[in-house]
């Protein structure tokens, strides 16, 4: 039997990288969120995302639809005037225009409004494209400006999609509304306004419109739009009477020059 030297075991070193990793995992496990905290965090993130989506939608409705519609309406007005310059001929009856077809331009100088007028009041083909629509279908059909008597009734958006009738509530008696057609400028003078009426009250666009103060046939204009703003609960109505008829060959009427 021989003797041999037994070296002592090397000392255990603590605090190394592996130990630190294990300690970190233990700490993370100890801090693990409860199910309630996780649900609250996820719900909060969903609400934030929903809020961003809603803000984008509002921006689209209030701003971008106006940009697109005003661009479309401007192009339609330019194309309409160009077509007038290319050919003559008399004005046509309402039934000879197809739905969505432009045939006139309306100006409201006090409000700095210039918008093409198209046949019909359809949202997609007319109103949402920034145009003003002429009541021309079925029981709601109304006169044309060149008719010797009748009520030329128009509809337009008050908010979004070009909003050509946004500020018609600011019109006062005596303010001018001008309609330009292929051959003629028709100038109307605002006479009265109905601030609120149900959408079902179609008598406001009668040949002698109810509530306007007119009592006998004449050459009238009616503007209709939604009210209050950003809703379609009621209708706001503006009436006027024709005070001047001027051939385009003689130049613009005073209302568009002064």
Regions found by a protein language model. Name each.
Residues 1-40:
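Terminal targeting segments of Actinobacterial cell-envelope proteins
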Residues 35-36, 41-172, 176, 180-258:
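Solvent-exposed, non-transmembrane regions of membrane-associated and secreted proteins
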């Amino acid at each position: 039997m021989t003797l041999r030297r037994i070296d002592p075991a090397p000392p255990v070193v603590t605090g190394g990288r592996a130990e630190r990793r294990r300690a970190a995992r233990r700490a993370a496990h100890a801090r693990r969120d409860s199910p309630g905290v996780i649900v609250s965090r996820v719900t909060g993130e969903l609400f934030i995302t929903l809020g961003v989506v809603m803000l984008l939608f509002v921006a689209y409705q209030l701003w971008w639809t106006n940009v697109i519609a005003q661009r479309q309406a401007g192009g339609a007005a330019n194309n309409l005037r160009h077509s007038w310059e290319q050919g003559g001929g008399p004005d046509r009856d309402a039934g000879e225009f197809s739905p969505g077809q432009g045939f006139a331009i309306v100006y409201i100088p006090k409000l700095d409004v210039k918008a093409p007028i198209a046949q019909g009041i359809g949202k997609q083909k007319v109103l949402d494209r920034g145009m003003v629509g002429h009541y021309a279908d079925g029981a709601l059909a109304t006169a044309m400006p060149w008719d010797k008597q009748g009520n030329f009734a128009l509809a337009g958006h008050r908010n979004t999609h070009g909003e050509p009738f946004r500020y018609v509530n600011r019109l006062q008696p005596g303010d001018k509304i001008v309609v330009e057609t292929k051959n003629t400028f028709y100038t109307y003078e605002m006479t009265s306004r109905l601030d609120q009426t149900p959408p079902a009250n179609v008598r406001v666009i009668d040949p002698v419109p109810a509530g306007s103060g007119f009592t006998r046939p004449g050459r009238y204009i009616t503007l209709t739009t939604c009210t209050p703003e950003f809703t379609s609960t009621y209708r706001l109505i503006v009436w006027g009477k024709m005070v001047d008829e001027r051939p385009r060959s003689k130049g613009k009427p005073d209302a568009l020059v002064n």
